[in-house]
């Protein structure tokens, strides 16, 4: 009880300070949006202590990004403002993104304090409200739109679809990118369903239950595998993830892993939006071996999501409509023009032997090939040996053997 009273007193003091700051700003007529500074209309590369964008604009001078100011024209929606999502939102805010849409239904708890960003005095507030308050103070140039609800319910799903398709920097325009920073399969599938239906590009992220590995994945509907194309093992095995949760047992959580995953996620977002570097379709992280595997996955033609299959057909039509570029094959340079000794390269096995050593190739979906085939077992043919009957009796044969 005493802790609750103390927490409420701290919250009252915080609100009183905010009120005093707001009254002071209005009295001075500064017109700033929070954070103790006026809004900056245009990014500048001027190197002065009062310019929060000077080091970001230095990327242009160093030839990394051609037009960094373009970042202020983009809108990003973040679903899940927890360990990864809150840090992702903070990084994008510091980078000067144009607009952020935040979706989460949960509240800040003291158990969240190990996952960066949130502060103890914010316990009890909704995560989106606490995040918006902190982020506005960090960068008042960014526009924020927060929604405190669960996107997996039927009524909220329609509103979620509406906001990602109309909540861009210019109202009525779609967002440029959706980031999934949720921690359960149901929410990921909800985002996947919405983005497949709208043809919306999105990035998925996650941290393992033991907190020592994570990943990010870029999903372009029709072009790359969606989340339903290759479901996690726990889902493929028909296991209800709700039954995995036990009372008094929770998943591990490391702020270091959360920070690394959020960092590579935002890095991929910046490369995708500002068109520099190589954008990874899948990038993993294993803290135990410091291993960062990368790969790309083609969509599954037999995906359970009908909108995914529809997007695949549209993507194939788009690719087929592109003008075909003629591939000019360059002849390899001849190292030795003359062959004085008549040397020839001969295969170790003939084509007939190669066919016998290979088995039948199974019928697989497009894009999947077998590494090897199992040859069919052939029964060893034993030549028949016939012996002519000599006509001698068994006693005569035994007598001959004794004389040998």
From Swiss-Prot:
Lineage: Eukaryota, Metazoa, Chordata, Craniata, Vertebrata
Recorded superkingdom: Eukaryota
Keywords, ordered alphabetically: ATP-binding, Cytoplasm, Endoplasmic reticulum, Golgi apparatus, Membrane, Metal-binding, Nucleotide-binding, Nucleus, Phosphoprotein, Ubl conjugation pathway, Zinc
SS bonds (residue pairs): none
Protein name: Ubiquitin-like modifier-activating enzyme 5
Species: Bos taurus
GO annotation, cellular component aspect: cytoplasm; cytosol; endoplasmic reticulum membrane; Golgi apparatus; nucleus
Family under the similarity heading: Belongs to the ubiquitin-activating E1 family. UBA5 subfamily.
Positions contributing to ATP binding: 83, 104, 127, 150, 184
Motif UFC1-binding sequence (UFC): positions: 389-404
Single biological process term from Gene Ontology: reticulophagy
Localization per record: Cytoplasm; Nucleus; Endoplasmic reticulum membrane; Golgi apparatus
Annotated residues for binding of Zn(2+): 226, 229, 303, 308
Active site: 250 (glycyl thioester intermediate)
Biological role: E1-like enzyme which specifically catalyzes the first step in ufmylation. Activates UFM1 by first adenylating its C-terminal glycine residue with ATP, and thereafter linking this residue to the side chain of a cysteine residue in E1, yielding a UFM1-E1 thioester and free AMP. Activates UFM1 via a trans-binding mechanism, in which UFM1 interacts with distinct sites in both subunits of the UBA5 homodimer. Trans-binding also promotes stabilization of the UBA5 homodimer, and enhances ATP-binding. Transfer of UFM1 from UBA5 to the E2-like enzyme UFC1 also takes place using a trans mechanism.
InterPro entries: D-isomer_DH_CS1 (IPR029752), ThiF/MoeB/HesA (IPR045886), ThiF_NAD_FAD-bd (IPR000594), Ubiquitin-activating_enz (IPR035985)
Primary residence: cytoplasm
Domain notes: The UFC1-binding sequence (UFC) motif mediates interaction with UFC1. The linker region is required to activate the active site of UFC1: it region moves next to active site of UFC1 to reduce the amount of water molecules in the vicinity of UFC1's active site and thereby elevate the nucleophilic activity of UFC1 active site.
Pfam families in the cross-refs: ThiF
GO molecular function annotation: ATP binding; protein homodimerization activity; UFM1 activating enzyme activity; zinc ion binding
Quaternary structure and interacting proteins, as annotated: Homodimer; homodimerization is required for UFM1 activation. Interacts (via UIS motif) with UFM1; binds UFM1 via a trans-binding mechanism in which UFM1 interacts with distinct sites in both subunits of the UBA5 homodimer. Interacts (via C-terminus) with UFC1. Interacts (via UIS motif) with GABARAPL2 and, with lower affinity, with GABARAP and GABARAPL1.
Residue numbers of Phosphoserine PTMs: 45, 358, 393
Motif (UFM1-interacting sequence (UIS)): 334-346
Annotated region (Linker), positions in chain: 347-377
